[in-house]
Amino acid sequence: MKTFVRRYYVFAAIALWAIACWAFFQFWYPYHFFFQEQNQLFLWSSDYISSYLHPFRFAALIGDFLTQFYYYLYVGAIIQTACITIAGLLVYQAFRNFHVARPFALAISLALMTFVAVCHFSTSYRLSSTISIMSWTLTLWLVSLVYSRNKRLTIAACNLLVPTYLLFGLPEIKTIQKPDFILEKDFAVDCEYYFGNHDKVISIVESSEEHSSQMLFFYNLVQAQRGQLPENLLKFTPTDLGTFYKIGPETPMLTIRNMNELYWALGDMTFTERAAMMTNVFSHNNRNVRMMKRLAECNYVSGDTLAAEKYLRILDKTFVYHRWADNVRAHGKDIYRSKMEMVNQRDTITIGDNAHFLMMQLLDRNPDNTIALDYILCSTLLLKDIVNFKRDYDRYCTDKNKPRLKTLYQEALCIWLAGTNAPKEEWMKYIQRQDVLQRFQQYNSQRGNPAFKDTYWYYFDKIKAPDV
């Protein structure tokens, strides 16, 4: 029994480490894999693959090839753990060939594996760096193998370092850091929204104790598409609608990615295409398969079938998304019929990122675009801009005889009516919810009372408006 333990405890320790590593990344850090898969593009074409045939690029070729399979559940953690474990086993065998004692060789192996795993806590750390480390550990193992059999040839075997360097280059090394579980939550809501799991987005946000702007952006985006943005706008403060975003040199990558989702939901294909292009620019190697899909979609919806086909042909050369491209060609009109009805067909020139003007254009084209309506009204309310809220409410609700009797809007109208000393007829015209009117009277007798934290009146009096 002791002989058995001495013989196999090393591999048992490495196997247990590998299981723990896989479990951690699969169950506590899975969305990092989806994020990396979506932020690259790998094509099965000779022209594309030939772009990797340069010094130091072979690790990138293998890494990007394997990363595309992160699309599939469980596969990302399996690939990453397998690569790290192989590197660890090679290091262990190499040091054993150099006659290092088993416990020390095992300690070195586990230390390397742990360090590489920690590097993967960073989203910017690519699988190609781990592939590069594997190549160097393989070279070390080959040199050690020669050393164990013929020490005189060891120096000659060291010549393997040159081709290894030319093929794989040097790996990127990250500083020691903790897992970023806040960023993982950001990726979670982003990916679940992308996958169409809107209920899960709401569940993640509402069950979290802390909320980032990314989480609240997608929470509001889901609620808007369900027609429930006014009911949930003030559930978490400060909140984030995305309508005040500006693209510039200091704009975070996640913010740039979010903008195309906002414009797509609103129905503006020109701004969707622009935002998708910007995301491509700031992605890994300026390639982003998720944005390729979005560019195909927005051009298809806007009627530019030639441009859409250009992106669909690119996706035809991917392993994962070629079926998606075929489905768009076959059923695109049915899939995007409702989106086509929202599109602004007028020729307009828009300068800058003025989301308010953009939403006005969309509503002038289609007054039934409730997503744009709620976003334009809620945006002005977040800024406490009651005058412009009233103007937009009249233009798109009152004047069209389609009052949107949401509690939030009724509460905001109470503020405008009270502030302008409106006559009774105006109150009767705008305030059609008697429960809101009664509560407004109660609030006026105890302004700022936390018992009214769920009202717009409390927000208007007590909460700081976002800086624009």
Annotate the PLM regions.
Residues 1-20:
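Start-transfer (signal-anchor) and selected internal transmembrane alpha helices
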Residues 22, 26-66, 70-75:
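Membrane-interface coil-to-helix junctions
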Residues 362, 421-468:
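Terminal, low-structured helical/coil segments at or just beyond the last alpha-helical repeat
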